[in-house]
Amino acid sequence: MLYKLLSSYITLTLLFLLLAVGAAIATFIENDFGTASARALVYDHLWYEALLGVLALNLLAVIHRTKLYRFKARFLFHIAFVVILLGAGLTRYLGNEGIMHIREGESASSFLTTKPYLQVTLHEGTSPRTHFFPLEITAWKNRLQKSLPTQSTPLKIALVDSFIHKEGLGVSGYFDLELLHKEKRIKKRFTHNLASSLQKETLWLDDLQVDLAYGPQEIPLPFSLSLKAFELKRYPGSRSPSEYTSHVALVDPSQKVALEETIFMNNTLSYGGYKFFQTSYDMDEKGTILTLNQDPGKEVTYLGYALLFLGLLWNLLDPTSRFRVLLGRIKKDSLSLLLPLCLLSPLASSLYAQSDYLQGYLKEHQKGSQELSKGFGELIVQAKMGRMEPLNTLNREILYKLSGKSSFLGMSADQVVLGMLSNPRAWQGVPLIRVKTKPLQELIGIHPQNRARFNDFFDENSAYKLQKEVERASTLPPSRRGSYENDLLKVDERLNIALMVFQGSLFKLFPLPSDPHHRWLNLKESIFMLEGEEAKTLHQATALLLDSAFERQYFKGIEALQTISFYQYKKGNEVIPSESKLQAELLFNRLEIFPHLTPAYLVLGFLVLLSAFGLLFFPPLASHRVRVSFHLLGWILFALHTLGLLLRAYVSGHAPLSDTYESMLYISWSGMLGALLFFRHSLFALSASILMAGIFLFGAHLSHIDPEITNLVPVLKSFWLTLHVSVITASYGFFGVGAFLGSFALALFILKDHLKTPLDKPIHQLSQINEVSLILGLTLLVIGNFLGGIWANESWGRYWAWDPKETWSYISILLYALILHLRLLRPKHYDYLFSLLSLWGFGSILMTYFGVNFYLAGLHSYAQGDPLPIPLWVYALSLALALLSLIAYPHRHLQNSDKGNS
């Protein structure tokens, strides 16, 4: 009976659900009450660990009952999870981790634990006795009751009260201890916060001295580390760290070992079973903070990872695997195409009414400044975080921030910014600043126009019209800000950017000679800080450039640009990128590949989708030539997409996976690649992939996602991170395709009972294609997650931190594993159920990707506890999909494939 229960697929399903729901609840507990509460109630609690243990037993029992060991690939990746759980258990129960702080010229032979302890020292007789009790205060019941023997009556210690308050990513609060010895009773309060320092108190209970301490426990090491020097490198002209290194000496007298090593991010020191990681440093840059761990489970865990990766990849190649069998069926059931025609028309634009002078100036500036502006954009500028880039890149970011466009009134970003810099008074009268909401337009006095002039924001007394409203909106938590408040704060930011352009403070164009940090100066700073004949020539050239643009004698400014460029290369050549990188970045900016790809993907996706539906009703219209044409168009768009990613990677110096914008570009790319390689025989799958690519690109260019190219922080400079992010985000593309295919199938369920055309077979084919997509997605998601474990362990010594993003990724694995194993339960109406779950399962991916970033506080998050309001379109889309699911339900029966084993 027990064996039957353990080897049941129903047990497996329940375990997946319980583990996923428990982890999901824990992420919200952590957001509201802190990490310690989430760990105490879920992750570290016996009930959750017991579920993981039962899951391991369930896997072993299922493997034995189904004789899965006969199929080597499937056996390898299933048994790998058991090995990984075993390694995790060894690390959790036998491992140790802590923090070591060393100042330059000093040494340390002990470390502090990451978890807090209550330390009780009893002074009796000749030697005091110290007891350690782990005590981490959480939002729920905290228990501590101890009875310690003394020479007379026992000392009783109890925790009687506690309170915590969430503050950003941390918590603060207090707890009260009550001590009883003989007839003496004392109550003592300790504060609880993120500080690692030890809190100490000495109490007397009659003749018994008791020393209490709360904080990390100090653990001695059999060797010592001394810090010879700490080195911090920053990005040019910036305070942002590029790399920090600890030069240490290790001495072990017992083994007669003395060696010198360097520790920096992603480069560790291993000795005596301990591994040291560079974590942080003192603000005066004279001390280092290292984390260390002792991990007896590492070899077992890495063995599990190796088996997992080998098994999953082998499974994709194994001709007997579910993946290859389905792929074979899809090829046999190839669908043809129908080509509908469609006409596109350009959008018209209108000019605002302006004064005769301003209209004349703008018209002349548009025509006459093109050559000068092009050279202006080719100057080098030091941007945020010290990134060196063509001025054209910064100009484009400025114009996009101000107007939401990459060009304005027929002028390039370089022309606009040069005009604002050289003739601020004229440009303060140009309606350039975007204002979305009607109440704000009315407050400024521009309604019904949606663009405001700089001058519109000030009344006749030069008072800022938005001052009070901005102050009010700034004090509101994000969850209480409506569209008006959000637009208000964004417009205020745009106005400040415009002001900085007019003042020239954004443009760090001039290298400061002999500066150790390679700092560059803006226009105003250069006047006061650059001296000598060269500086005088430079100032004259700058004045000539601005005067020539102001007087509209643009040819005069060409020589001035050459003088400025010569000075840049002479004084700042050490940090200026190569000519090939600069030209590549200018080409990348000029092509605007991703904004142009967005409508192309969407239009092509809808054309293919219309063709797929048309084929169901007019099969004779199918054409091999049309199918090939669609595929060729898909490959052309994919090639352009690939070119854009390669250019961005080249100019940034790192893989384009470092932020939300870049990862969305990559997700859409991976979805297209999967469709072109695996789904070329299905129009529905091809259209789903193309639409998914277009929607992700569209999302990447929404106003709250920043496309700016930036330098990497030190911890992100890792091969394992690049591999982890690229693989895991690629999986999102396949899950997105699965969600689209699920929605298409549900739509066909609704249509099948109202049309004469039989749709049962196409629905079943869609389910098979969908399953292939989800298998690919889950394979990549699992591999990507465990590659992330390798990166985290090699970077700071912890595979898994139960951070909300990690946790929701783990939840996604559980949910999609459940969806793909659902057929083993042989449910009725399997195709409907599978389509439904593949659609709604994508919600876990969206939560992993967007929800955690903006609604939960964590290491991967942009939120700090106050969530942003959920956009109305999310509710509308959810309602529409819910209606689709409900309307399809009465039509869920198919004639030939009701069981999941079909």
Curated annotation (Swiss-Prot):
What are the record's GO terms for cellular component? Answer: membrane; plasma membrane
Q: How does it sit in the membrane?
A: Multi-pass membrane protein
Q: TM spans, by residue?
A: 9-29, 75-95, 300-320, 335-355, 602-622, 659-679, 731-751, 772-792, 832-852, 868-888
Disulphide bonds annotated for this chain are none
Spell out the subcellular localization from the entry: Cell membrane
Q: Which UniProt keywords apply?
A: Cell membrane, Cytochrome c-type biogenesis, Membrane, Transmembrane, Transmembrane helix
Might you name a Gene Ontology BP term for this protein?
protein maturation
Which Gene Ontology molecular function entries are recorded, alphabetically? heme binding
Protein name per Swiss-Prot or TrEMBL: Protein NrfI
Q: Which organism is it from?
A: Wolinella succinogenes (strain ATCC 29543 / DSM 1740 / CCUG 13145 / JCM 31913 / LMG 7466 / NCTC 11488 / FDC 602W) (Vibrio succinogenes)
The record lists the lineage as: Bacteria, Pseudomonadati, Campylobacterota, Epsilonproteobacteria, Campylobacterales
